[in-house]
Amino acid sequence: MDSIPAMKIVARIQSEFPQKFGIPRQSGLVEELKAAIVFEPQYRIPQALRGLEGFSHIWLIWLFSEAVQSGWSPTVRPPRLGGNTRMGVFATRSPFRPNPIGLSAVRLDGVRQDEKLGPVLLVSGADLMDGTPILDIKPYLPFADSHPLASGGFAEQKRGVHLQVDFPPALLDRVPERHRRALIGVLAQDPRPSYHKDPQRIYGMAFAGLEVKFCVRGSVLTVLQVLRS
């Protein structure tokens, strides 16, 4: 079989990230991040979700929509290795794949019935940009999907280090309270590209309608400005 049926977009995610910069590198790293999955009109059928509420977590199969036009590469530079070492694309989760498909496990917080949008899935811990197309949704099965003795290869050897976040109270007050823990969690993950280590450089990250400017010196990330975007 040389061809497969065309994939259908079943939903899109609504998240606090209008751009790629700042998105956690894996799902579940910042559980405080809230998002919503809105189905396309032809899939707003409550019966299609029957039984899903019994699962605490779900798998999202999605499209790297920003990488579709970029092609693929047999080797890539994983951020975990500082962006300097090449690994095979199939040993990584790089978006630059023959088929630019992503896979994320997220917590299912509930299903909201919306008059216009139909059933909407409320999730936590997603690592997706706002508007990302969702190709499929499957339940997470602990007895089959969890492997406590699994080896993480080079990713296990290079565990991420959390930064200490210095967020001046006057600036934190500009962030709506419902977004504060999530924003601090994202900043603690060090949003910078792995090859950026200049302590004098100022970075800007769009999040939840805000533009957050910061710098990193050593293991401390200092927030410098919070502006309405």
Report the location of each language-model feature.
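Conserved positions in beta-strands of structured domains
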Residues: Q14, V106-D109
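Mixed-charge, low-complexity intrinsically disordered regions
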Residues: M1-I101, Q113-L122, A126-S229
